[in-house]
């Protein structure tokens, strides 16, 4: 029996994934499923450039902006939710189209994942209380005693990873990195993944990155982050989306708005460069779509269903 198709549309930030994926879903009777680790959070749709409501009104979108920013989210949790949505979409006769640039999620979905046990809520609260009392440096020192491997790999300024590693070693008695040596678990072995990699020319991509981030700053991102700062302690939130730290620094009068934007643009370009390198080296079997200007991109959009040899539907 032939395997069912799943499309994964990936690429660096600002490469046009959302636009292209939306057009593809409309052309091929598909539904969109998020595969971006930051676009799951409901309080930050602007800074994460989540798909607009106009897109969501035309076709079904799944796993976008549904999770409170206070809730921890792991690759295992994502995979379970994604598998449910993929099975639901295919059961309805539609084509699942996954869009995003989070390499860990894509790699785990396609090639399998290391299943790290869930952390109990009691322990999670205890570790956060401890961190609040002793800070990053002392928590890193304590991690060194319990898990020297993790402490050597995790910078003490990386609060989220530091807390996560400390939780895991307390919960399991094992290093968080020890789980990487275990056999990987596959959850969608009955599917065939067709991976499309958007590969814009570097200079063109950087131009789009700068323009998009400037628009994001103008279109409400500052108010969005100001509200989060008012309601929550940012130290305990999963605020890794580029631009958030810079806006927080602006709100705390540590940077001017221009400095915050310039710094965020620089970080975005560096992030895009790392993404391109990762996709080129980690995902060997893929369809690469190259383009160097807006006209090239529009041509790719018009011809995509032909280029990747897709039927009009997955029925």
UniProtKB/Swiss-Prot annotation:
Its cofactor is Mg(2+). Keywords: ATP-binding, Magnesium, Nucleotide-binding, Transferase, tRNA processing. It comes from the Bacteria. It is an enzyme of class 2 (transferase). It catalyses: adenosine(37) in tRNA + dimethylallyl diphosphate = N(6)-dimethylallyladenosine(37) in tRNA + diphosphate. GO terms for biological process: tRNA modification. InterPro entries: Dimethylallyltransferase (IPR039657), IPT (IPR018022), P-loop_NTPase (IPR027417). Its EC number is 2.5.1.75. Substrate binds at residues 13-18. The record marks 102, 124 as: Interaction with substrate tRNA. GO terms for molecular function: ATP binding; tRNA dimethylallyltransferase activity. ATP binds at residues 11-18. Signal peptide: none annotated. Residues 36-39, 160-164 are annotated as: Interaction with substrate tRNA. Monomer. Belongs to the IPP transferase family. Catalyzes the transfer of a dimethylallyl group onto the adenine at position 37 in tRNAs that read codons beginning with uridine, leading to the formation of N6-(dimethylallyl)adenosine (i(6)A). This is tRNA dimethylallyltransferase.
């Amino acid at each position: 029996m032939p395997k069912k198709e799943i499309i994964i549309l990936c690429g660096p930030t600002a490469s046009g994934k959302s636009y292209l994926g939306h057009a593809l879903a409309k052309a091929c009777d598909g539904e969109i499923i998020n595969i971006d680790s930051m676009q799951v959070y409901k309080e930050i749709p602007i800074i994460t450039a989540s798909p607009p409501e106009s897109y969501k009104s035309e076709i079904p979108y799944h796993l976008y902006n549904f999770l409170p920013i206070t809730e921890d989210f792991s690759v295992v949790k994502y995979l379970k939710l994604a598998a449910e949505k993929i099975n639901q979409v295919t059961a309805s006769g539609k084509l699942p189209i996954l869009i995003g640039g989070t390499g860990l999620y894509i790699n785990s979905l396609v090639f399998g994942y290391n299943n790290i046990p869930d952390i109990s809520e009691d322990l999670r609260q205890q570790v956060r209380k401890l961190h609040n009392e002793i800070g990053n440096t002392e928590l890193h020192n304590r991690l060194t005693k319990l898990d020297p491997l993790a402490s050597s790999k995790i910078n003490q300024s990386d609060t989220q990873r530091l807390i996560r590693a400390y939780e895991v070693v307390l919960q399991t008695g094992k290093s968080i990195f020890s789980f990487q040596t275990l056999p990987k678990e596959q959850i969608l072995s009955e599917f065939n993944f067709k991976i499309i990699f958007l590969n814009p020319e570097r200079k063109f991509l950087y131009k789009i990155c700068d323009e998009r981030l400037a628009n994001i700053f103008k279109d409400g991102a500052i108010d969005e982050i100001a509200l989060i700062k008012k309601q929550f302690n940012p130290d305990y939130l999963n605020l890794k989306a580029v631009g958030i730290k810079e806006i927080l620094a602006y709100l705390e009068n540590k940077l001017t708005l221009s400095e915050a934007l310039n710094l965020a643009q620089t970080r975005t370009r560096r992030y895009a460069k790392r993404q391109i390198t990762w996709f080129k080296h980690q995902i060997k079997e893929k369809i690469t779509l190259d383009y160097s200007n807006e006209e090239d991109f529009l041509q790719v959009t018009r011809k995509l269903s032909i280029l990747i040899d897709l039927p009009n539907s997955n029925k």
